[in-house]
From Swiss-Prot:
A double ring-shaped homohexamer of HslV is capped on each side by a ring-shaped HslU homohexamer. The assembly of the HslU/HslV complex is dependent on binding of ATP. It comes from the Bacteria. GO terms for molecular function: ATP binding; ATP hydrolysis activity; peptidase activity; proteasome-activating activity. It is found in: Cytoplasm. Belongs to the ClpX chaperone family. HslU subfamily. Signal peptide: none annotated. Disulfide bonds: none annotated. The gene is hslU. GO terms for biological process: protein unfolding; proteolysis involved in protein catabolic process. SMART domains: AAA, ClpB_D2-small. This is ATP-dependent protease ATPase subunit HslU.
């Protein structure tokens, strides 16, 4: 767990997300509180619960991105789920406990990756021995092996093709599922794992690859042999329980409006199933039981039709921190195009560079792109920052199509060029409803 201060966390989020200071502050404090909790004595540490967050705001304003960047910054296990994908227990569909099982799988992958770094040097040496074995065989003399080892390290043999045996991660029978209930028992009964243990280890497969590319397979393979798999699982479960972040999107879609009938019953059932998960329960996974008491839950929704007060009172109480994200304005769009770390403009310039085409956007073009995006959001449907992608694709459609034939040329995009390609379309809202 990183020990960034709230100000540093907000500053890092500012590199990728424009505006939404209140939401950034809320998640920054939540992340810092996790670090603070780790500094407490064990008895008190168990009593400090995370303050779950409810984000309210229209689509495309940064709700998901804030959570995703936060998890990346913290190096924490993170899963994003949509509330509408789940059904209450007893109905056909995924049950909410699958969220925790997915979180554990992410934690296992993250932990294994971190632990591999600690044994990478030894794994590299072991991988080198296996490459030599593939090149000269097991019976080669020490002098021959040393000669090939020097060639291998100098890069002379990089393009030579070899055959290697690596662990077969895919295949097998996978997890057992109850028919008609996809996801119901994933991770609890894994027949593939049971068969592998019965046969004394995992399966292998033969891969044909170049010497250079073989290291990618072999280093991972050798790293896993050096790792204590029980320790990987122990650390991963601890990471999921103490550092895990779950982002539940579209929670407004399972809010039952007053007087609602029919599907409202099932939606309320999903809310009731979420209650113990958010408050703290123990979920059985194939790696062992996982407690959710200290998992941070961030729920979000547009709440166009339903209101936060339409959620079950018990669920509202388990989402104590509420932040409202505002709709984006013209200046926000301009800043998104120019100030973010990997802005759309930087992406398109880099993409065209691969074709030998130099792309340049004038300041008035950027302002015009922002204006068109705002106008379309107002007149058609407000999809937030995602509108910029459709506008940019429309503007650069011709350049992208002809780029291979224009290698070595320079293209300047100004306001007139933007108007020429999307101006009329933006004005005709009936038409743009279907095209943009």
């Amino acid at each position: 767990m990183s020990n960034f201060s709230p100000r540093e966390i907000v500053s890092e989020l500012d590199r990728y997300i424009i505006g939404q200071k209140e939401a950034k502050r809320a998640v920054a404090i939540a992340l810092r509180n996790r670090w603070r909790r780790q500094q407490l004595e064990p008895g008190l540490r168990e009593e400090v619960m995370p303050k779950n967050i409810l984000m309210i705001g229209p689509t495309g304003v940064g709700k998901t991105e804030i959570s995703r960047r936060l998890a990346k910054l913290a190096g924490a296990p993170f899963v994003k789920v949509e509330a509408t994908k789940f059904t209450e227990v007893g109905y056909v569909g995924r049950d909410v406990e699958q969220i925790v099982r997915d979180l554990v799988e992410v934690a296992i992958a993250l932990t294994r990756e971190k632990m591999r770094e600690g044994v990478e040097a030894r794994a590299h040496l072991n991988a080198e021995e296996r490459v030599l074995e593939a090149l000269v065989g097991r019976t080669a003399s020490p002098a021959t092996r040393d000669s090939f080892r020097q060639k291998l390290r100098s890069g002379e043999l990089d393009d030579k093709e070899i055959e290697i045996q690596v662990a077969d991660a895919g295949g097998g029978m996978g997890s057992f599922e109850i028919p008609g209930m996809p996801g119901a028992n994933i991770g609890v009964l894994n027949i593939n794992d049971m068969l592998q243990k019965a046969m004394g280890g995992g399966r292998t497969k033969t891969v044909k690859t170049t010497v250079k590319d073989s290291y990618k397979f072999l280093i991972n393979d050798e790293s896993d042999k050096l790792l204590d798999q029980d320790e990987v699982v122990r650390r991963a479960l601890s990471s999921a329980e103490n550092d895990g972040i779950v982002f539940i999107d579209e929670i407004d879609k399972i809010a039952s409006r007053e007087g609602g009938m029919g599907a409202g019953v099932s939606r309320e059932g999903v809310q009731r199933d979420l209650l113990p998960l958010v408050e703290g329960t123990t979920v059985a996974t194939k790696y062992g039981p996982v407690k959710t008491d200290h998992v941070l839950f961030i729920a979000s929704g547009a709440f166009h039709v339903a209101k936060p007060s339409d959620l079950l009172p018990e669920l509202q109480g388990r989402l104590p921190i509420r932040v409202e994200l505002r709709a984006l304005e013209k200046e926000d769009f301009r800043r998104i195009l120019t100030e973010t770390e990997a802005s759309l403009i930087k992406q398109y310039i880099a993409l065209m560079e691969t074709e030998g085409v130099e792309l340049e956007f004038t300041e008035d073009a950027i302002v015009r792109l922002a204006e068109v995006a705002v106008d379309l959001n107002a007149s058609v449907e407000n999809i937030g920052a995602r509108r910029l992608q459709t506008v940019m694709e429309r503007v650069l459609d011709e350049i992208s199509y002809n780029a291979p034939d224009r290698s070595g040329s320079k293209m300047v995009i100004d306001a007139a060029y933007v108007d020429q390609h999307v101006g009329d379309l933006a004005k005709n809202t009936d038409l743009s409803r279907f095209i943009l």
